[in-house]
UniProtKB/Swiss-Prot annotation:
One of its GO terms (cellular component) is cytosol. This is Putative pre-16S rRNA nuclease. Belongs to the YqgF nuclease family. It comes from the Bacteria. The lineage of its organism: Bacteria, Pseudomonadati, Campylobacterota, Epsilonproteobacteria, Campylobacterales. It comes from Helicobacter pylori (strain J99 / ATCC 700824). The keyword tRNA processing does not apply. Could be a nuclease involved in processing of the 5'-end of pre-16S rRNA. Keywords: Cytoplasm, Hydrolase, Nuclease, Ribosome biogenesis.
Amino acid sequence: MILACDVGLKRIGIAALLNGVILPLEAILRHNRNQASRDLSDLLRKKDIQVLVVGKPNESYADTHARIEHFIKLVDFKGEIVFINEDNSSVEAYENLEHLGKKNKRIATKDGRLDSLSACRILERYCQQVLKKG
């Protein structure tokens, strides 16, 4: 199974590819990086993930780039890790919340649903770029 994550300072959005369908999963709320990396490691183990797709911004965001790489090194995972450009994935995900009112959009942003929809976009890009080549 393939899992994607959108690593943020407060939440980690999660999406999975199941039988060819991309599904958002419950986001990991991040209290500190050790707890978050442990939670992600546990999820990867429980779901028997073979490939972890990680969203990363372009090189001009050096601090974020380094922070994401450092976080992923804390994750206990022996499978394949693939980094995919995440630029605008959160903007695209936010557009998917158009049907929600202002208050519900705010709630979706805070509870991690937006982050997991962003992880869906990252997983879509992986499927388009990597799986289509095979």
